[in-house]
From Swiss-Prot:
This is Probable DNA ligase. The keyword Protease does not apply. It catalyses: ATP + (deoxyribonucleotide)n-3'-hydroxyl + 5'-phospho-(deoxyribonucleotide)m = (deoxyribonucleotide)n+m + AMP + diphosphate. The gene is lig. The lineage of its organism: Bacteria, Bacillati, Actinomycetota, Actinomycetes, Mycobacteriales. SUPFAM superfamilies: ATP-dependent DNA ligase DNA-binding domain, DNA ligase/mRNA capping enzyme, catalytic domain, Nucleic acid-binding proteins.
Amino acid sequence: MSPSHAKLATVLLFDVATASADVGGTPSRLTKVARIADLLRRAAPDAALVAIVVSWLSGELRQRQIGVGWAALRSRPPAAAHPTLTVVAVDAAFAEIGAVAGKGAQARRAALLNALFAAATETEQTFLLRLLGGELRQGALAGIMADAVARAAGIPAAAVQRAAMLGGDLPAVAAAALSGEAAALSGEASALDAFTLRVGRPVAPMLAQTAAGVAEAIERHGGQAIFEAKLDGARVQIHRAGDQVTVYTRSLDDVTARLPEVVTATLALPVEALIADGEAIALRPDNSPQRFQVTASRFGRSVDVAAAVAAQPLSVFFFDILHCDGVDLLDAPTTDRLAALDALVPPAQRVDQLLTADPDAAGRFLEATLAAGHEGVMAKAPGAPYQAGRRGAGWLKVKPVHTLDLVVLAVEWGSGRRRGKLSNIHLGARDPATGEFVMVGKTFKGMTDAMLDWQTARFTELAVGGTDGYVVRVRPEQVVEVAVDGVQKSSRYPGGLALRFARVLRYRDDKGPAEADTIDAVRALY
């Protein structure tokens, strides 16, 4: 039976939820891959179903955002006794929730969400809660998922990885691989075109590793590095085909309509076909950067673009180029790509640069960049290619960090190799007016195995109301020092603020909760 006439599969939400639990419960990469591959075979050859399953097990919704925040997930109805929800039906429910708009939208979304949870079993509710809350960390992310797709389809993992890198969308690649289009990934030239670099289709962006300082960055790049100012704006990927410009976020969402300034700047360039990396940023009259949140506000779904442009226009700075008028530059060295960019983009729309082997010169460049209000520098290897979709060693970020002493309010049980350990900590800042603690974020980053053992014992002692649930509430007594990249506005937490990239440095047994940083100290970083 050909794929086009094969009977389409029915997969229940329960099947995905149990697979997720199984994957989260094993530290074995091979076992994770095998479990996911088995589920994907069941979903095949239904391309849409495969794409949904891959998205969910990667911790993402097909719809990206559906307007459901932390507050909406705090309570849920009693669970259903038996599983009846199909994956397709739940995906349709997500789409319906995301489409709600206008007066009474919040109440309507809440009603739809309640109906969905009421039809879900306890296992399914737990999965939905973690998926919608952004807490689905189970190791079933890009690398493992790509291997699982390859195993399920019987094709090389490298083919899947490259297709996902260039297509920018692993669910779409999985759908093609498991719906009879595997030739598109394994070598037939006519089909392979579907997953090559193409103007108008976003590419998974290259990401940076971290270096402790400029001297380390120079050493890791072989004795010389290209330093660039790291702007605290919003990364954008810009595509141009003739007079058509499309702008994507780093998560590959199309935001063209919200960023007319980027479109105008791109149309002014002497080029017909372009894929470029850039940074959109709100600047003050003196060209110093506005707070990150000012830039981020332009990316909201309900933004009044005309009013926003009039109130605070955005500027765009280009820092890399992937394609120019028929020439793919992904595999070209950094120096060649930057030369192509310099020939195309005016200096006023380029980030400041310094090519040097001298740590002192690099240090002065970093200091000047920070003095200008930017967040740090990027150090790039002169000979490195553009490693789309990877946190490549060719890019290193160097920036100062802020530290806060916060109080642990609750802890979540871990999964995978952290199964049986209290892992993800809820962080609170002290409210000097009430003496209470205001939640401002969560983190599981920076914890060593020894730290996990210690905090499991410590927070078991501090637990309030038992340790049987997924989230263990604790007495607010333990102070922890965390490093953060900054703070942003957020409706997710009661304090209205959220920490950016928080990671644990150490527990401060020398400090009591009364010595923890206040919510005012957190606001000062905003």
